[in-house]
Amino acid sequence: METESSLVNIGPSEFIDSFTLMDARLETGIKMRFAIGGNGPALMLVHGHPHTHIIWRKVAPLLAQKYTVVLPDLRGYGDTDKPESTPDHRPYSKKEMAKDLISLMKLLNRPTFAFVGHDRGARVGHRLALDYPESVTKAVFVDIAPTATMYALTNKEFATKYFWWFFLIQPEPFPEKLIGFDPDYFLHHHIDGQIKIKGCVEDKAFNEYLRCYKDPRTIHAICEDYRAAATIDLDDDKEDADKKIQCPLYLLWGARGTVGKLYDVVGTWKEKAVTVSGEALDCGHSPEEECPSGFLEKVLAFLD
């Protein structure tokens, strides 16, 4: 059921200079928190797990010198709504998340835009580019191989390094209760295990991630995101197996991270997109936090 759309100004961002926080009531029924700043062509940047839109705090101000930069919190994450799920996990499918993003850009009167997604955000971006090829002009995916590919090639090393892919998909409330017992520990373990440049996540940023993560509704929503990835998202991908991303796709990944070590990243995406290029940066899973200068250099060169 569609809902009347609206925008509410929350005030200046505490984390990203010259950006404004806003809430958008989308036609999908979701109230989405996002930050916006800058002028120029539209550019959307979407976080992954276990983050929120503030993961872009080191790169967004410079991108905003050339673009109107939109930084949403995905449904289930941050200060965006966490809708009730269903047995098939459809509300947390990448298809539904992509609808939210298109609805937001429609509300902002930005029918076309470039897209940068990290982690789960890039998985939403994959679906976004397939379902709305007329809207996405260019795409950057950060530190992922395709979901179906990663599941199909699962081995001991991947299952050990990315254990949460298999932990979070267990039936509720098993993972929810275990994480909820000590979300601070779980979040520290997760982030510290993926970054390779220590100190890149300031205490203030970590505490903001934790503020959101310790909400039981967030924990459940995150589990549903992963449950969807292991079920209905794979069904959607299988149904669209003959479709490819039409816009130019650029890939960045951390040379010291799991994805870069286990996969031919560009090769995996050549099966999914028409035009693919990419390269590694000397970091772990989160280039935008670990090596923002290198990230900006590569992304701006591609977008320009």
Go through each PLM region and give its residues.
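Flexible "cap/lid" subdomain of the alpha/beta-hydrolase fold that forms the substrate-access gate
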Residues: 2-25, 32-35, 39-42, 70, ...
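Catalytic histidine-centered segment of alpha/beta-hydrolase-like enzymes
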Residues: 283-296
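Active-site glycine-rich loops that stabilize anionic/oxyanionic intermediates
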Residues: 40, 48-51
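Alpha-helical elements of the RecA-like P-loop NTPase motor core of helicases
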Residues: 54-57, 220, 297
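A short, Lys/Arg-enriched amphipathic alpha-helix followed by its capping loop at the start of a domain
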Residues: 58-67, 107
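Structural cue for short, hydrophobic secondary-structure segments
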Residues: 45-48, 71
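Serine-hydrolase catalytic-loop signature spanning alpha/beta hydrolases and amidase-signature enzymes
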Residues: 50-58, 69
